[in-house]
């Protein structure tokens, strides 16, 4: 399903989704705009509430500093196991292709709910 992630988070009951993806959310690359990024500890907590034990959170970006922020945010929720950086099968998105064309490295993070 493709939809506005924030709208779905607010409306869905716990355990609704087995797999949640946020692929290439807006990186807000200017330092003064970093606080506008979607992936933060509150977002991770809300997403983990939506998945059952064994469910996964998949994040992807082509901005290294955003990847660092995503890694740190995933670590804030103890219900998640360590994030893997092995890319799971998925289509190449338009934003991903833009990043590749610009020479940026793609980072995929996949964390599984363990408790």
Task: Please describe what each predicted stretch is.
Residues 37-56:
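A short glycine-rich, Lys/Arg-flanked "PGG" loop and its adjoining helix->strand segment in the class I
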